[in-house]
């Protein structure tokens, strides 16, 4: 592996957890595509680094800074990575706790594409509605 993609993912999750969007931006390809599933106001395909960072900002804004993605495990090879995470957040009187699988395509040491797969999309949709 020319670039240690496992460390790229680890650094990305640490930057996200600490709110370090500048560092996180360094780990995203300029032409990244981020696929957020579901039927809620945050669902959709986000194209470009600025769009993805704006999405991340909304996650924190909508939850009063309580949004977390706690990593259970990370796996990576030369081209792909997987993050097994538990997502937790609060929004008013609503709480969210759900397990997600984040599948990454990495290119030149940066995240080029990500697909989020929820184990309970209906619960996530209700939370973000």
Predicted features and spans:
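Short, low-complexity N-terminal intrinsically disordered segments enriched in polar/charged residues
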Residues: 1-30, 125-129
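Ligand-binding pocket scaffold of soluble enzyme catalytic domains
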Residues: 16, 90-92, 113
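Short beta-strand segments enriched in hydrophobic/aromatic residues
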Residues: 28, 87-89, 118
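A short, polar/proline- and glycine-enriched secondary-structure boundary/capping micro-motif
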Residues: 45, 93-96, 122-128
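Hydrophobic/aromatic beta-strand elements that line small-molecule binding cavities or substrate pockets
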Residues: 69-74, 87-88, 99-105, 115
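A short hydrophobic beta-strand element
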Residues: 78-87
